[in-house]
């Protein structure tokens, strides 16, 4: 008899599953007999419990298991027979009216949608390009120098002495202070500290606090009012005004290392050659620029694909992805050391929009890959692994690390597929190239 698939909406379907009671009962009897061989009951040796007693105690549980298995098997059979592309898990409910000789259930489920991808020639993508020159290399060297800064006390004698024992604190100096803060003449938690160090101008402290410390000499103090922002992380003081007194204990000036052979060696250039150092920095910056431009253009391509595609998204797939995102969030909390992170009450609803985009994009990409043969080839995967491994000290070991784990390799395969899609779309879309600075590129990729 043909199966009747009811259309309940754009993607929702329903089909009736009928299971002959005699077939179900035979399976129940067979499982009860198998169970009886190992079941234990007081007063009986293992395997010697009367079958009737085993059936009385376990028949309900066994019947539920058999029905669950049979329903799943029959649904799978019907799905194949009717060429149903089921999205997510179906729900099964017993029908209100039951026949005498059969169990009847309604299976409600969603199917995968038809994906219509519009004309790629209408898609618009802006592709950023970046040139790495001396200015970018010098800027990177400046950052590397600041990362290796050493602080020396004002007035210190010797190689790094500055003779400035009476110099007032200025931006860039590391200062050590005592401070006392009160609100309405009452001290508050976190408002008092001794020998507290920070670097002026780094923005670690609130602006009013840094301004008060600027210009002080060792031994001097200043009293000032500070209004905490309304969104300050300390809820007890947020939006309130405190009166602080800060006392300067120590002022240290920053000594940046010279760019010389020793500096180059500290960056891994064994012979200290400055030309080699700059060449290696340039290579690293170009690699980073390539990675960031690829990431930005990939996001633009994905946005363009979503814009020109038409499809309905199965709710079941969105809900599944919401749960995946919840678990990812819990894992992130666990890695940060948050107690009981695996049970954190994270509402799935907060990921609804993100999950819908991810599912929709996945369906569009699957259709595009299938229709245009954009699957990842083994040689493409290997080329990407080799490229990634270049930035490590032992590239061969990194390659072995990738190929020793199927999950890691699958992640690289997914990356290659995305790259194939991006290249395919760029070959057909309206692409505008735009030259941007490395700093602008870094800012754009951080926001993407």
UniProtKB/Swiss-Prot annotation:
Catalytic class of the enzyme: isomerase
Subcellular location: Cytoplasm
Domain of life: Bacteria
Example of a GO MF term: peptidyl-prolyl cis-trans isomerase activity
Family stated for the protein in its record: Belongs to the FKBP-type PPIase family. Tig subfamily.
Keyword Cell cycle in annotation: yes
Gene3D superfamilies in UniProt: 3.10.50.40, Trigger factor ribosome-binding domain (3.30.70.1050), Trigger factor, C-terminal domain (1.10.3120.10)
A Gene Ontology term for the protein's cellular component: cytoplasm
Name of the protein described by the UniProt record: Trigger factor
Reactions performed catalytically: [protein]-peptidylproline (omega=180) = [protein]-peptidylproline (omega=0)
Domain PPIase FKBP-type: 172-257
Key words of the record: Cell cycle, Cell division, Chaperone, Cytoplasm, Isomerase, Rotamase
Disulphide connectivity of cysteines: none
């Amino acid at each position: 008899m043909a199966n009747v698939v009811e259309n309940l909406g754009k993607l929702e379907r329903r089909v009736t599953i009928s299971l002959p009671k005699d077939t179900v009962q035979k399976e129940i009897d067979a499982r009860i007999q198998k169970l009886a061989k190992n079941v234990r009951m007081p007063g009986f040796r293992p395997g010697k419990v009367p079958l009737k007693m085993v059936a009385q105690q376990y028949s309900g549980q066994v019947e539920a298991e058999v029905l669950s298995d049979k329903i799943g098997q029959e649904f799978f059979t019907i799905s194949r027979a009717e060429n149903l592309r089921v999205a997510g898990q179906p729900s099964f409910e017993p029908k209100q009216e039951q026949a005498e000789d059969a169990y009847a259930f309604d299976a409600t489920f969603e199917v995968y949608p038809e994906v219509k991808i519009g004309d790629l020639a209408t898609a618009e993508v802006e592709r950023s390009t970046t040139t790495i020159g001396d200015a970018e290399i010098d800027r990177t060297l400046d950052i590397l120098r600041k990362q290796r800064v050493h602080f020396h006390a004002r007035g210190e004698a010797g190689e790094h002495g500055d003779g400035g024992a009476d110099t007032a604190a200025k931006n860039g100096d590391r200062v050590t202070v005592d401070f006392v803060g009160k609100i309405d003449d009452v001290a508050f938690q976190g408002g008092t500290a001794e020998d507290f160090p920070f670097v002026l101008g780094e923005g670690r402290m609130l602006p009013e606090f840094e301004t008060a410390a600027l210009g002080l000499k060792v031994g001097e103090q200043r009293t000032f009012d500070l209004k905490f922002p309304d969104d300050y992380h300390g809820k007890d003081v947020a939006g309130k005004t405190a009166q602080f007194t800060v006392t300067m204990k120590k002022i240290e000036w920053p000594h940046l290392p010279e760019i010389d052979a020793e500096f180059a060696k500290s960056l891994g250039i064994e012979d200290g050659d400055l030309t080699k150092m700059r060449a290696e920095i340039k290579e690293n910056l170009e690699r980073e620029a390539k990675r960031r431009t690829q990431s930005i253009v990939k996001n633009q391509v994905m946005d363009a694909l979503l814009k020109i595609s038409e499809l309905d998204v199965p709710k079941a797939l969105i809900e599944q992805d919401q749960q995946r995102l919840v678990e990812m969030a819990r894992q992130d909390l666990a890695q940060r050391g948050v107690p009981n992170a695996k049970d954190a009450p994270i509402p799935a609803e907060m990921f609804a929009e993100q999950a819908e985009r991810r599912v929709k994009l996945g369906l569009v990409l699957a259709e595009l890959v299938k229709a245009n043969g954009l699957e990842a080839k083994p040689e493409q995967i290997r080329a990407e692994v080799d490229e990634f491994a270049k930035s490590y000290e032992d590239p061969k070991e990194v390659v072995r690390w990738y190929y020793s784990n199927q999950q890691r390799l699958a992640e690289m395969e997914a990356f290659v597929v995305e790259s194939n899609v991006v290249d395919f779309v760029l070959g057909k879309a309206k692409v505008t190239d735009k030259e941007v600075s490395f700093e602008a590129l870094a800012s754009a990729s951080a926001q993407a």
